[in-house]
Amino acid sequence: MNISATARSLLLQEFVSAFFLAMRYFFKPKPTLNYPFEKGPISPRFRGEHALRRYPNGEERCIACKLCEAVCPAQAITIEAGPRRNDGTRRTVRYDIDMVKCIYCGLCQEACPVDAIVEGPNFEFATETREELYYDKAKLLANGDRWEREISKAIALDAPYR
């Protein structure tokens, strides 16, 4: 055993360095959050609860093109299109998402040409029954109305990367 190793063991260098390291972290602010009361930041690309958006005049955006239904790998989306209107457009009569099947891949949002179906910022939608996870058009539109400000802000932040 050489002299430097003996000196280090006598002076308890590892103990002292560990003690100062512990003291440094002891007085730092805690990195954890008190979750139900504090929420961390969410990325603009976060994929949470689905929502159907409306135009500013209140008309729903969905044009019943059924691209989201076709691209969904889990086959969680069911759409029934209504008859064509006088102006040539059509809207959905039925728009259902089975959230039990959904894998939150975001392909429906990417496929939508008018940004009608989006995945919003809400990640707290636990339910007591499976039936509550079958979203119909009214529930999706209500989600869109509730989260419109956050959704439009996230889409604007993500626009340069699309």
UniProtKB/Swiss-Prot annotation:
Q: How is the cofactor bound?
A: Binds 2 [4Fe-4S] clusters per subunit.
Cofactor (UniProt): [4Fe-4S] cluster
Q: How does it assemble?
A: NDH-1 is composed of 14 different subunits. Subunits NuoA, H, J, K, L, M, N constitute the membrane sector of the complex.
Q: Which residues bind [4Fe-4S] cluster 2?
A: C72, C102, C105, C108
Where in this chain does the record put each 4Fe-4S ferredoxin-type domain? Answer: 52-82, 93-122
Q: Which residues bind [4Fe-4S] cluster 1?
A: C62, C65, C68, C112
Keywords for this entry?
Answer: 4Fe-4S, Cell inner membrane, Cell membrane, Iron, Iron-sulfur, Membrane, Metal-binding, NAD, Quinone, Repeat, Translocase, Ubiquinone
Q: Membrane topology type, per the record? A: Peripheral membrane protein
Q: Where in the cell is it found?
A: Cell inner membrane
A biological-process GO annotation: aerobic respiration
Q: Which PANTHER family match?
A: NADH DEHYDROGENASE [UBIQUINONE] IRON-SULFUR PROTEIN 8, MITOCHONDRIAL, NADH DEHYDROGENASE UBIQUINONE IRON-SULFUR PROTEIN 8, MITOCHONDRIAL
Q: Which InterPro entries match?
A: 4Fe4S_Fe-S-bd, 4Fe4S_Fe_S_CS, NADH_quinone_OxRdtase_chainI
Superkingdom assignment: Bacteria
Catalysis: reaction(s): a quinone + NADH + 5 H(+)(in) = a quinol + NAD(+) + 4 H(+)(out)
Query: Per the record, what is one GO cellular component?
Result: plasma membrane
What GO annotations for molecular function exist for this entry? 4 iron, 4 sulfur cluster binding; iron ion binding; NADH:ubiquinone reductase (non-electrogenic) activity; quinone binding
A Pfam family? Fer4_7
What's its job? Answer: NDH-1 shuttles electrons from NADH, via FMN and iron-sulfur (Fe-S) centers, to quinones in the respiratory chain. The immediate electron acceptor for the enzyme in this species is believed to be ubiquinone. Couples the redox reaction to proton translocation (for every two electrons transferred, four hydrogen ions are translocated across the cytoplasmic membrane), and thus conserves the redox energy in a proton gradient.
Please report the name of this protein according to its UniProt entry. Answer: NADH-quinone oxidoreductase subunit I
Q: What is its EC number?
A: 7.1.1.-
- Originating organism: Bradyrhizobium sp. (strain ORS 278)
* Family per similarity comment: Belongs to the complex I 23 kDa subunit family.
